[in-house]
Amino acid sequence: MPLHHLTRFPRLELIGAPTPLEYLPRLSDYPGREIYIKRDDVTPIAMGGNKLRKLEFLVADALREGADTLITAGAIQSNHVRQTAAVAAKLGLHCVALLENPIGTTAENYLTNGNRLLLDLFNTQIEMCDVLTDPDAQLQTLATRIEAQGFRPYVIPVGGSSALGAMGYVESALEIAQQCEEVVGLSSVVVASGSAGTHAGLAVGLEHLMPDVELIGVTVSRSVAEQKPKVIALQQAIAGQLALTATADIHLWDDYFAPGYGVPNDAGMEAVKLLASLEGVLLDPVYTGKAMAGLIDGISQKRFNDDGPILFIHTGGAPALFAYHPHV
């Protein structure tokens, strides 16, 4: 098996079973194309989400190192920070979160509801900064301060997007390949591409398991020119650690994230409402709504390689709906 080196990396079991892969019949009728969804929004801790896959590897490494504190960073409404804090609470670890307000809002819901509310419930230590200009360096500075207070910190990068964290989505590719055995002629997989770990892990895994399937990353914060080097760097780092080659091109669409990261747009919100009304599935305004807008528009614009079924990776994020009210 080409991915057998995955077993070399310690993994903390947090998810327990493959997440569902479901056909969306009513949504499929809308653009006239078979659409499936991988439900990583229903992972079992703290309202779900994709970051749990990365945390299985990252937190296993933290425990191996004897850490008693997890430190990470993100936006006030970060799904990654929420899931990291929840795992810390579950394991009896301290969690410190370095947060920014990337959209510069004073809206009370954004500042106090949604993911931010959950951080308080998980007893997270919050540290605010004006902007995450160099998050890796800022996290190291914070870790030094926390260590001086007597803690044993472990730094988890923004989005959990290191080569180690991204192993969670190489693992996910194994699940997808097994679950898609009954999906005839799967053409494409669509995923939101942000901190790049989910995208890069899937790129490595699917290249070796489903080489004929096109993987599209819909950017949520950067242009193709800015995002592609980030995905490629992680893709190559992952492949190196797994003793694999990674030659698949990285496909990105950057037409759907404007006006910027964390700012809802009309197409994304229409996609959120469409999935809710047709399938009872909740997307979010920051990641999956914009990615689904790209999928739907990509069908209408004939941007996919062929007319076969499409799989959408639902990375979660529904708690942010409450933070973005009344835009929802």
Curated annotation (Swiss-Prot):
Stated name of the protein: D-cysteine desulfhydrase
Top-level EC class: lyase
Keywords assigned: Lyase, Pyridoxal phosphate
Gene3D superfamilies per the UniProt record, alphabetical: 3.40.50.1100
The enzyme's E.C. designation: 4.4.1.15
Organism: Salmonella paratyphi A (strain AKU_12601)
Lineage: Bacteria, Pseudomonadati, Pseudomonadota, Gammaproteobacteria, Enterobacterales
Pfam families, per database record: PALP
GO biological process: D-amino acid metabolic process
Keyword Transferase in record: no
Its job: Catalyzes the alpha,beta-elimination reaction of D-cysteine and of several D-cysteine derivatives. It could be a defense mechanism against D-cysteine.
Catalytic activity field: D-cysteine + H2O = hydrogen sulfide + pyruvate + NH4(+) + H(+)
HAMAP family per record: D_Cys_desulfhydr (MF_01045)
Cross-referenced SUPFAM superfamilies: Tryptophan synthase beta subunit-like PLP-dependent enzymes
An annotated Gene Ontology molecular function: D-cysteine desulfhydrase activity
Family: Belongs to the ACC deaminase/D-cysteine desulfhydrase family.
Named cofactor requirement(s): pyridoxal 5'-phosphate
Modified residues annotated as N6-(pyridoxal phosphate)lysine in this record: 51
Assembly description: Homodimer.
